[in-house]
Amino acid sequence: MSAVIDTPDHHAGDHHHGPAKGLMRWVLTTNHKDIGTLYLWFSFMMFLLGGSMAMVIRAELFQPGLQIVEPAFFNQMTTMHGLIMVFGAVMPAFVGLANWMIPLMIGAPDMALPRMNNFSFWLLPAAFGLLVSTLFMPGGGPNFGWTFYAPLSTTFAPHSVTFFIFAIHLAGISSIMGAISVIATILNLRAPGMTLMKMPLFVWTWLITAFLLIAVMPVLAGVVTMMLMDIHFGTSFFSAAGGGDPVLFQHVFWFFGHPEVYIMILPAFGAVSAIIPTFARKPLFGYTSMVYATASIAFLSFVVWAHHMFVVGIPVTGELFFMYATMLIAVPTGVKVFNWVTTMWEGSLTFETPMLFAVAFVILFTIGGFSGLMLAIAPADFQYHDTYFVVAHFHYVLVPGAIFGIFASAYYWLPKWTGHMYDETLGKLHFWMSFIGMNLAFFPMHFVGLAGMPRRIPDYNLQFADFNMVSSIGAFMFGTTQLLFLFIVIKCIRGGKPAPAKPWDGAEGLEWSIPSPAPYHTFSTPPEVK
């Protein structure tokens, strides 16, 4: 432990050395900023890959009739798009933000367990190399949807399913190690005076998210291992012929899957809770209630999983319980939304790019929440289930929710990361193009879904043609706009107006007390928090 509690003068010369030179700096790095950067670049590459798969889906659905891909390949695209976006884009992006920002926010010299931190990143290229390689195997890649329901993913799966299972194992191990690292850091490395109730909300949401990850990732590992056993080792967990039950798969999967969707949104809640007070130039309204609301959401996320299964045939008592439990999540979520709105109320608002994304987050995430309340109503869900209405719902919480939260965070902290201000005009252009493209892409899906257009089908009835064309145009617009974001980031790294230590007027917190760009080693001597 001596390295953690060293006196500041010990190895005085070592405290200001920069990174090693060359490629091995990145392979072997234990520096939280390097690892955060690796996560962020990796997640953006996966975002572009998963996004290009979505472009294939939308190109096929531009017109009715089978146009450009075979139905079998279409199913591989929907499956891989979901898996890559969830496990490859959204989650690693938030882990990257956690690695970069949590030590700076709590005054820690680095993350706890830095070598495990490095390993948890390097598992990801292996996992996704394995996953993407399945597309080139005989019989093709996973074609059973990102939820990989048995028996489609077991009895009737392509041969490549085994590689998919190992990819999920690797991604899960990575997530667990990242979460352990976050918890160890937050609980052990806070600066003197930084009590739990003084932590920035981003740190709080990540602490709770990390506990969620540790709780549910083993469940995911368990369910894919049961699949592996059914496929190769003669068990019958999910096969009725051998005394098993395909519905068991759904229960185990969604017991992981529902907390998982909260894992993807809670860090965004934390980031937005840092950004809105900054640009409203007043403290966050209801800090304590925000902490308790986050914890309530996390707790409730474990008791709602069967709302994904209303049409499977579960006892009506069960449907009632899961319906009411699901609706209950709207309460702490509503607390959060009203706190954000109240924070903006009578503030001295300015709308720089991070604030634009944060305000869009609040508005559009709320729309996604309302359609979620509709889906929670068990009798109504018989109409909505497996239609594009569900696709509209979860893309309204994932795109303006998770993705806009990531964009807002990136613009907010880019000056701290690079030492330069990004191009504000281009940032605003990126926002408006993303905002318009996203709404064009996903709003019409509510209509075609309510009219009965089923999900995951490469062809559709003529009556849905117009809205699908609008959706596809919006999707292409949203997709191409992300190349502009890449340009903005590279331009910001290469140069631009030098960023001060605190580039935003209303910003609070330890991360703004260090120079921009953040030095390679920070808080070697812990700061005092009053």
Q: Which residues are covered by each model-predicted region?
A:
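Membrane-embedded and interfacial regions of multi-pass energy-transducing membrane proteins
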Residues: 2-530
